[in-house]
């Protein structure tokens, strides 16, 4: 049944793409349906401004009474009242004088905030307090209208009896709130309602003795729109956000969520902004996970998240990015705004930095919570101290000097792994030269590193050299030039040729005595090094490994180049980059041949972008392994994007098993074969109201679905409803998650409902739909 339903949604998306209906800005359409204030807004105290009255007939009994009849038109500042009969009554004398105006036989009142019509009105001219009967009201410049049997209009609020409210445009009562009493606060932009009934198409669906509702853009505490759905993991679920506007610079959202398969999950988020910084603190907690297929020891599932950015004084900065979950399966089992299973790890960092024009330093703490099933995780850097110094224009402007220094202490949760202090200094001297033909940069650098190491505390821990010194000099020569010509094989275009030549030399140093030698469960090298991914731009990097513990030898030339095509408006429409490293000697880090380059050349690397038209974009990258005579890595993306949020994207990814094995240590590759994945994303604002999003990813090598999603959303000016169906891979059979040895999928269905028009912002919701999922939409083009 689920598959048939899903196919129906997919078919709807496919056929809707061929709709001839164009998309118009929904917000502009909605604003066109509400009254706008005509003329220039008059500033100042309206009560002190003169009153102008026009009428067909006037009877004056000065100073106590005046009667105006026939097409009565009264203006004062931004206020404008039209009625058939108006009476002005004055009583008292001097400071105690009281003036009242009575509109009879129907009236029409307008100002820059509200339009009001009714049968009769009484206006206290001293205070402008107004009482009306059988009134209809419409906000000016924003959505919101209704009626009231009687209304008291005051400077700061409107008190309505037997009243209604809706944000729908005139002649549309898709939803409406009826209340025995309603108080609308003008400056605070919210309404209180007592004995409120929520109606949909005239049918009562909800009653509450008290309700608060925003009627503007200001934040207000209260219930937000809930969401509900079902999932094979969670069962039926219901989520109810509760918003608390603590202060102008503090707010919080609490979201209880009930899942029939798992129980209650309590979620909360606190946001703050003060003189020293801004940030967000969030938590998710499920006390007892009742899901029958979850076999983890810890039934209490939780998440903590903290992001903070602060400016301390003029030159100090503090940054915190901390995410911690109860178990490795958390992001696979729960959809969260604070992480994803595709990330592979949760970051836990804090950094305090000081900046000056030519130097800066920072002290930080860094660790990662890895979700892979590994017995030895990454190292923690507790603490890490970095220092950078820059001095340009030395030797009469010929040389640039830079110094990077670092001290860091490494710890590991595994008692088998060693701990260490690492002290590193990296001075460099650059001789940059450039003219209209190109640039030449000669750089010399020295890597000076000292380690103080201790073996792991376990009796099975391997012995390790306690003190290690490493000194590696480096020289790099980088030459670039740009050649341009308007004589190309494509008429109307200017072509550039940009050759890029680099020579890099760094002598070999055996670094096998840095960190663990034998533990194959550790996924890195040393303490913080890992083999970097390769592409065209990586050909010109100094190092093959991240971190500082593995600095490979180098005696190599990098040959590369880029060609670009520009149209007559100087817009870049196409580029192609191609390059390769030529090794004069193997690049090594130790005596293990698996860690060295083999052959005299690296893979060919290619990158290309092509803007075929204003609507069509293509991007591709390709690597060819000359040693194995096979493709090692490839990906391509083609996108049709005729309008802002309308797009169709096709993509393909490939990585050979040899490439994966080269970049990951033993046991890290769970596929044990090539990776071949195809995918497509479709998003279309079919008309003024309909939004469709579809996504499909399939692993060809495994012949397994990765993710498929279809969502439909219908928007009007005052409400929207969205439904979505999703099926995605939760885990593979070698995960210790379930006794079921087959691949595990989660099938889910969700529905969202939203009241719109309560503020000025209108949007289709298509961006939010694209951001969800295992593989959210990415626009990879740079043309």
From Swiss-Prot:
GO annotation terms (biological process): Gram-negative-bacterium-type cell outer membrane assembly; lipopolysaccharide transport
Keyword Signal: yes
Localization per record: Cell outer membrane
InterPro entries named in the record: LipoPS_assembly_LptD, LptD, LptD_C, OstA-like_N
Taxonomy, superkingdom: Bacteria
N-terminal signal peptide: 1-24
Any one annotated GO CC term: cell outer membrane
Major subcellular location class: membrane
Pfam family, one: LptD
Similarity comment: family membership: Belongs to the LptD family.
Oligomer and partners: Component of the lipopolysaccharide transport and assembly complex. Interacts with LptE and LptA.
Name of the protein in question: LPS-assembly protein LptD
Organism this protein belongs to: Mannheimia succiniciproducens (strain KCTC 0769BP / MBEL55E)
Higher taxonomy: Bacteria, Pseudomonadati, Pseudomonadota, Gammaproteobacteria, Pasteurellales
């Amino acid at each position: 049944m689920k598959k048939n339903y899903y196919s129906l949604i997919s078919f709807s998306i496919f056929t809707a793409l061929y709709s001839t209906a164009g998309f118009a800005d929904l917000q502009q359409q909605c604003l066109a349906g509400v009254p706008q204030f005509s003329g220039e807004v008059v500033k100042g105290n309206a009560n002190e401004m003169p009153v102008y009255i026009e009428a067909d007939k006037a009877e004056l009994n000065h100073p106590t009474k005046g009667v105006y009849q026939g097409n009565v038109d009264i203006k004062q500042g931004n206020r404008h009242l039209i009625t058939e009969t108006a009476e002005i009554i004055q009583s008292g004398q001097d400071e105690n004088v009281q003036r009242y105006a009575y509109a009879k036989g129907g009236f029409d009142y307008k100002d820059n905030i509200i339009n009001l019509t009714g049968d009769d009105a009484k206006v206290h001219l001293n205070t402008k307090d107004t009482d009306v009967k059988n009134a209809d009201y419409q906000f000016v410049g924003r959505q919101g209208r209704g009626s009231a049997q009687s209304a008291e209009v005051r400077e700061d609020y409107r008190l309505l009896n037997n009243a209604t409210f809706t944000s729908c445009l005139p002649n549309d009562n898709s939803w409406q709130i009826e209340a025995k009493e309603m108080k609308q606060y003008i400056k605070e932009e919210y309404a209180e309602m007592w004995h409120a009934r929520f109606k949909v198409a005239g049918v009562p669906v909800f009653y509450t003795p008290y309700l608060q509702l925003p009627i503007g853009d200001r934040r207000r505490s209260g219930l937000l729109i809930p969401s509900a759905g079902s999932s094979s993991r969670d069962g039926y679920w219901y989520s109810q956000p509760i918003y608390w506007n603590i202060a102008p610079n503090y707010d919080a959202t609490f979201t209880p969520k009930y899942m029939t398969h798992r129980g209650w999950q309590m979620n909360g988020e606190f946001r703050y902004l003060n003189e020293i910084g801004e940030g967000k603190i969030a938590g998710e907690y499920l006390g007892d996970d009742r899901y029958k297929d979850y076999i983890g020891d810890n039934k209490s599932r939780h998440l903590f998240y903290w992001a903070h950015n602060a400016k301390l004084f003029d030159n100090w900065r503090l940054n915190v990015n901390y995410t911690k979950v109860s178990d490795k399966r958390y992001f696979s089992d729960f959809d969260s705004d604070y992480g994803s299973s595709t990330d592979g790890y949760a970051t836990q960092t804090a950094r305090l930095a000081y900046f000056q024009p030519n130097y800066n330093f920072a002290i930080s703490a860094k660790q990662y919570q890895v979700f892979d099933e590994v017995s030895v995780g990454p190292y923690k850097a507790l603490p890490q101290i970095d220092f950078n110094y820059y001095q340009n224009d030395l030797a009469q402007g010929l040389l640039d000097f830079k110094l990077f220094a670092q001290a860091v202490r490494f710890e590991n949760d595994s008692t088998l792994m060693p701990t260490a202090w690492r002290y590193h200094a990296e001075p460099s001297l650059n001789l940059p030269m450039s003219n209209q033909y190109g640039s030449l940069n000669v750089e010399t650098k020295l890597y000076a590193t000292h380690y103080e190491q201790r073996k792991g505390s376990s009796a099975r821990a391997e012995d390790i050299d306690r003190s290690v010194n490493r000194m590696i000099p480096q020289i790099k020569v980088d030459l670039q030039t740009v050649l341009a010509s308007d004589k190309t094989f494509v008429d109307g275009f200017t072509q550039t040729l940009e050759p890029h030549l680099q020579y890099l030399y760094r002598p070999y140093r055996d670094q096998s005595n840095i960190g663990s030698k034998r533990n194959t469960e550790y996924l890195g090298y040393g303490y913080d090094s890992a083999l970097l991914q390769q592409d065209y731009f990586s050909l010109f990097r100094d190092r093959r490994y991240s971190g500082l513990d593995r600095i490979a030898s180098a005696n190599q030339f990098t040959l590369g180049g880029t060609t670009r095509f520009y149209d007559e408006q100087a817009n870049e429409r196409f580029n192609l980059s191609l390059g390769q490293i030529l090794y004069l000697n193997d690049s090594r880090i130790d005596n293990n041949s698996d860690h060295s380059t083999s052959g005299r050349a690296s893979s060919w690397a290619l990158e290309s972008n092509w803007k075929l038209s204003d609507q069509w974009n293509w991007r591709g990258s390709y690597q060819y392994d000359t040693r194995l005579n096979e493709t090692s890595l490839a990906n391509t993306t083609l996108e049709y994007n005729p309008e802002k949020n309308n797009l169709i994207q096709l993509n393909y990814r490939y990585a050979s098993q040899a490439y994966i094995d080269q970049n990951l240590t033993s046991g890290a590759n769970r596929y044990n074969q090539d990776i071949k994945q195809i995918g497509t994303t479709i998003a279309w604002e079919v008309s003024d109201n309909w939004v469709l999003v579809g996504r499909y990813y399939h692993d060809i090598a495994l012949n397994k679905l990765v993710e498929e999603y279809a969502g439909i959303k219908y928007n009007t000016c005052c409400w929207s409803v969205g439904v979505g169906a999703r099926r995605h891979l939760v885990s593979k059979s070698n995960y210790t998650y379930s006794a079921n040895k087959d691949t595990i999928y989660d099938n889910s269905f969700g529905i969202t409902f939203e009241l719109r028009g309560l503020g000025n912002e209108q949007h289709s919701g298509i961006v939010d739909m694209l951001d969800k999922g295992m593989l959210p939409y990415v626009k990879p083009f740079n043309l």
